């Protein structure tokens, strides 16, 4: 990955102008590539749209275009050419030779960002696995970057052709080892998650296109210092915090990695565990930047990924963010009329209270509310309810303490069974 102590590499960004795609659409793709490249730490020196009737098997772009690019790269002292397309290993290798510069395709660039953003041990291993699987057929790449603390695709290249056979063997061995380690991590996570599944906190996951404002909204709701900046993929590993709701009650809220259009399928599979909180959530908040002219396309992109994760049937509330940037509220009013939608500004706080109220109603529909009466002297069971239920209200009496709690049906049954077996003086009364 790019080293922070070095000056950023100067890059030229290349987008193919294909016959069936409008120039405006291609320009939007190029604009997105600018954001991706900046996030990866590159200095964007130039961007260029190149007409392409059909991809050339050897170099992707035509020979005349490649020659012109080579001259420009030499004159402008450009270090990296970023191609907004998935290149074959042969195309990438040939382009690097002809351009005399490092060539990175879309998949490699996204991997570079993931590598820089991974926080947990599991996230780092997932990045490394995805990078290695990407590199397997790119024989000029070296495995030496794997010795770094975080994996990446290595924008600065490797030691050369004589390493190819060694690379093949080392990469195969490392992939096998990583898969075994990740299987063990997944088993451990399943065991660690089991106690939390018994805690009746309603789980909500923030999802959305990159830069939709998820982390900013997460910070506002939780007052947590999660990395929130104007860069794509600002959160790679899910971060969870408890959020207090109006009228009592709590939820577990998770902030997750943003999705993008044309995310390579192999990356979705490699990062599936990173999105585990999405797959296990009781509810999704789909955060949409309504001020972006391309917001409808982004919604389609996110919905496509959710379908791949098989969570499209999870109850979803669409949160239209950045409404403070709208020139007219007409579009917001139209979308709010569809239902299961709400408008907010994570920047100004507008709409956050109604959002919390909506979450409160969702919790109320999913959880059971009970009045629990127990002796004041029974500190163990008092602590147990605080640990294993969402305590909405506490009323202290002379001899008894009364709790209003919310909990899942399975947890209620388990606690009632424990009370009966132990013969303790605890009463349960449903609250309408």
Swiss-Prot record:
Segments forming domain Hflx-type G: 202-367
Residues reported in the UniProt entry to bind Mg(2+): 215, 235
Matching PANTHER family: GTP-BINDING PROTEIN 6-RELATED (PTHR10229:SF0), GTP-BINDING PROTEIN HFLX (PTHR10229)
Function per UniProt: GTPase that associates with the 50S ribosomal subunit and may have a role during protein synthesis or ribosome biogenesis.
Binding site for GTP: 208-215, 233-237, 255-258, 321-324, 345-347
Organism from which the protein derives: Magnetococcus marinus (strain ATCC BAA-1437 / JCM 17883 / MC-1)
PROSITE patterns: G_HFLX
Cellular component GO terms, alphabetical: cytoplasm
Gene: hflX
Coarse class of the protein's main subcellular location: cytoplasm
Gene3D superfamilies: 6.10.250.2860, GTPase HflX, N-terminal domain, P-loop containing nucleotide triphosphate hydrolases
Keyword line: Cytoplasm, GTP-binding, Magnesium, Metal-binding, Nucleotide-binding
Subunit structure: Monomer. Associates with the 50S ribosomal subunit.
Name under which the protein is recorded: GTPase HflX
One Pfam family per UniProt: GTP-bdg_M
Family: Belongs to the TRAFAC class OBG-HflX-like GTPase superfamily. HflX GTPase family.
Cofactor: Mg(2+)
Compartments, record wording: Cytoplasm
GO molecular function: GTP binding; GTPase activity; metal ion binding; ribosome binding
Family annotation (HAMAP family): GTPase_HflX
């Amino acid at each position: 990955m790019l080293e922070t102590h070095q000056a950023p590499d100067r890059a030229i960004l290349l987008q193919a102008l294909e016959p069936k795609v409008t120039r405006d659409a291609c320009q939007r793709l190029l604009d997105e590539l600018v954001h991706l490249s900046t996030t990866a730490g590159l200095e964007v020196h130039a961007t260029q749209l190149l007409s392409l009737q059909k991809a050339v098997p050897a170099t992707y772009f035509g020979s005349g275009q490649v020659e012109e690019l080579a001259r420009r790269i030499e004159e402008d002292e450009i270090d990296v050419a970023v191609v907004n397309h998935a290149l074959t290993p042969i195309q990438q290798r040939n382009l690097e030779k002809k351009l005399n510069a490092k060539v990175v395709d879309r998949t490699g660039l996204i991997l570079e960002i993931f590598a820089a953003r991974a926080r947990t041990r599991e996230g780092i291993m997932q990045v490394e696995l995805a990078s290695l699987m990407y590199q397997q057929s790119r024989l000029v790449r070296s495995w030496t970057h794997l010795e770094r603390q975080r994996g990446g695709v290595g924008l600065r290249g490797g030691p050369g052709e004589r390493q190819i056979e060694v690379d093949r063997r080392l990469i195969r061995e490392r992939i096998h080892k990583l898969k075994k380690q990740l299987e063990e991590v997944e088993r451990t996570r399943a065991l660690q998650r089991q106690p939390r599944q018994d805690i009746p906190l309603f789980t909500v996951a923030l999802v959305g296109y990159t830069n939709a404002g998820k982390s900013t909204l997460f910070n506002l709701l939780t007052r947590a210092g999660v990395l929130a900046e104007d860069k794509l993929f600002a959160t790679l590993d899910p971060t969870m915090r408890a959020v207090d709701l109006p009228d009592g009650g709590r939820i577990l809220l998770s902030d997750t990695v943003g999705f993008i259009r044309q995310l390579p399928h192999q990356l979705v599979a490699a990062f599936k565990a990173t999105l585990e909180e999405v797959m296990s959530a009781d509810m999704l908040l789909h955060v949409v930047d309504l001020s972006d002219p391309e917001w409808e396309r982004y919604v389609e992109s996110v919905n496509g990924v959710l379908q791949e994760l098989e969570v499209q049937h999870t109850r979803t509330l669409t949160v239209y963010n950045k409404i403070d940037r709208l020139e007219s509220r007409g579009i917001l009013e139209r979308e709010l009329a569809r239902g299961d939608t709400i408008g907010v500004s994570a920047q100004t706080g507008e709409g956050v209270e109604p959002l919390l109220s909506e979450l409160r109603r969702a919790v109320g529909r999913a959880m059971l509310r009970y009045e629990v009466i127990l002796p004041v002297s029974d500190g163990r069971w008092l602590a147990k309810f605080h640990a294993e239920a969402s305590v909405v209200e506490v009323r202290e009496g002379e001899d008894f303490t009364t709790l209003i709690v919310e909990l899942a049906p399975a947890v209620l049954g388990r606690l009632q069974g424990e009370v009966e077996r132990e013969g303790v003086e605890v009463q349960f009364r449903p609250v309408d």
